Amino acid sequence: VKKRIDFQISGNQKCGTNALHNLLDQHPAVRMSSPKELHFFDAKNYCGDESAFQTYHRDGWGLGNGGLESAFLYGESTPKYVLLGPGGEARFLGRIQEYNPNIKHIVLFRDPVERAYSQWNMLRHNGRPVVDFETVVEVGTSAKSPQSSSFNIISRGHYGQICQNLLSLFGPERCCFIRVTDLNHQMNEVTDFLGIAPMNYETRYSYVLPYTSAMSEEARKTLRSYYGPEMVRFGELTGIDAADWIDR
């Protein structure tokens, strides 16, 4: 029996975390949490003692005594864990480091401009109070952007800072950064990172929310320019080619 889970799919929202969670859930050596997003480390009433950790294990994996079997790797997927504070600091990763400094992080990335619009569309579809996307872009890219869910849409695309925070706290050997193209064909990278055998996966249906309108060219151009320095930094830290995400 071990006392800590092994890995987290820590981000990013609207980058394929549902799909990756479902794919890994098919692996015989892996036990993924149910529900997918436990929101343990970002809870407002967070408590980081051993009793709370056992409750976390029971809630996520249905383990009666909170114990984790050594024969399996345990993982969960809460994209909010990589969320940034107003100064770019990690809001929740420090809690995770205290829980398990050896935990591994898998983080997915897609074009940050498309990711932002997808998140805004999801909030709107779910009936959350959200302003129009042009206002999100205008305010979210300003120097004093508020930290509400409407405006952290923009800061979630600060990929360079997100990677810097993870690397500083956990080191490169515990971080797997993936630019998503086709997850089914990228799973060997994930299994190699986790140290488990490769396998064939069954593709499961993933619902994509419809868009009522296309993103305006003005908003797109503003975000391309805004994210440019972050994408350069992201590429330098990860070795991932993000040239096509930069202002063009």
Show which residues each predicted segment covers:
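Surface-exposed cleft-lining segments at the edges of enzyme active sites
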Residues: 77-85, 140-155, 206-221
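Generic structural signal for well-ordered alpha-helices
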Residues: 53-57, 93, 163-164
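The conserved 3'-phosphoadenosine-5'-phosphosulfate
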Residues: 35-36, 154, 160-233, 239-248
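PAPS-dependent sulfotransferase catalytic core
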Residues: 1-81, 99, 103, 117-137, ...
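Conserved phosphate-donor/acceptor-positioning beta-strand/loop module used by diverse small-molecule
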Residues: 99-119, 181, 186
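Acidic-and-aromatic substrate-binding clefts and catalytic sites of carbohydrate-active enzymes
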Residues: 41-51, 81-89, 154, 181-185
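ATP-dependent NMP and nucleoside kinases share a basic, alpha-helical "lid"
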Residues: 86-106
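Generic structural signal for small/hydrophobic residues in well-ordered secondary structure
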Residues: 16-17, 75, 96, 105, ...
